A protein has these predicted regions:
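Non-catalytic structural scaffold of enzyme domains
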Residues: 1-230
Length: 230
C-alpha cells in the first residue's frame, strides 16, 4: 500500500472528513483491520486565511510548498491538498516536490465525465467560484460548462464557509440558503452541482437537493485510495 500524503488543516473540520474517508475506503476494499497509510501535515489555518483575503498568494504558495516537501521527506508516495481553494497554488506546490500531486478538480471532473455530466454548477469560496484556477481547469481540460451563482449569492456562500462551516457551526438557515442557491443553478441548466469547498458537504452532504451533488472531499479521497492500492 502506498503512503498518502495529506496537506490539511484548511480547515481541520474538513481534514477530519478526509481522514475518515481514506481509512473507511481502505477498510471497505481490504476488510478486517486494514487502514490507510497517511502522512498528515496540518497547518494553522488562521495565517493561511489572512494571506488568502489579503491576496498574498505567493506567500501561501511558499508556506504550503515547504509543508509539501516535508511530507515528501517523511515518505509519502503522492500528495493530496485537502482543500479546493488552495489548489490555486497547486502549480507551485507541484513544482516543489518530486512525488505526484492528485488534483481535486481532476478527480471530480473524471467522475462527472463518467456520469455523463457536461453542464455543472460550482459552489465554493469566492476564490474558487470567481478565479480561473478551478473553473478554467474544468473547462479547458475536460470540456465542462461551469455555472456559478450570481454575485450576491456567491458572497453568501463564501461568508457561510468562513464564518460558520470552518468553525464547525452548522445552521439549518444556512442549509436552506445553500439548497435554494443550488435550485437556482439547476433552474439555469446545471445537471449537477460540485461542492467545491471541502466544508460544504458538512452542511448539505446528506440533503436531497434539486440535482445530484458531487462532494469533492469524498471523490478526492476515493481517488487517493484507488491510487494507494494500485
Amino acid at each position: 500500500m502506498k503512503c498518502i500524503g495529506l496537506l490539511g488543516g484548511m480547515s481541520w473540520e474538513s481534514t477530519v472528513s478526509y481522514y475518515q474517508a481514506l481509512n473507511r475506503g481502505v477498510r471497505e476494499r481490504l476488510g478486517g483491520l486494514h487502514s490507510a497509510r497517511v502522512l498528515l501535515s496540518s497547518v494553522d489555518f488562521a495565517g493561511i486565511e489572512r494571506l488568502q483575503h489579503s491576496g498574498d498568494w505567493p506567500a501561501t504558495a511558499r508556506l504550503l510548498a515547504a509543508e509539501a516537501r516535508a511530507i515528501q521527506a517523511g515518505g509519502a508516495d503522492f500528495l493530496l491538498i485537502g482543500t479546493n481553494t488552495m489548489h490555486k497554488v497547486a502549480p507551485e506546490i507541484e513544482a516543489a516536490i518530486d512525488i505526484p500531486l492528485l488534483h481535486i478538480a481532476d478527480a471530480t471532473a473524471h467522475r462527472l465525465q463518467a456520469d455523463g455530466v457536461t453542464r455543472v454548477g460550482l459552489l465554493g469560496t469566492r476564490f474558487t467560484m470567481e478565479q480561473d484556477f478551478y473553473k478554467g481547469r474544468l473547462q479547458e481540460r475536460f470540456g465542462l460548462e461551469v455555472l456559478v451563482p450570481d454575485d450576491a449569492a456567491r458572497e453568501r456562500v463564501h461568508r457561510i464557509i468562513y464564518d460558520e462551516l470552518c468553525l464547525g457551526d452548522i445552521r439549518e438557515s444556512s442549509q436552506a440558503e445553500y439548497l435554494a442557491i443550488m435550485a437556482d443553478l439547476a433552474q439555469a441548466g446545471a445537471q449537477a452541482v460540485i461542492l467545491g469547498c471541502t466544508e460544504i458537504a458538512l452542511l448539505v452532504g446528506a440533503c436531497q437537493a434539486a440535482v445530484p451533488l458531487y462532494d469533492t472531499t469524498a471523490i478526492h479521497a476515493e481517488a487517493a485510495v484507488t491510487l494507494a492500492l494500485a
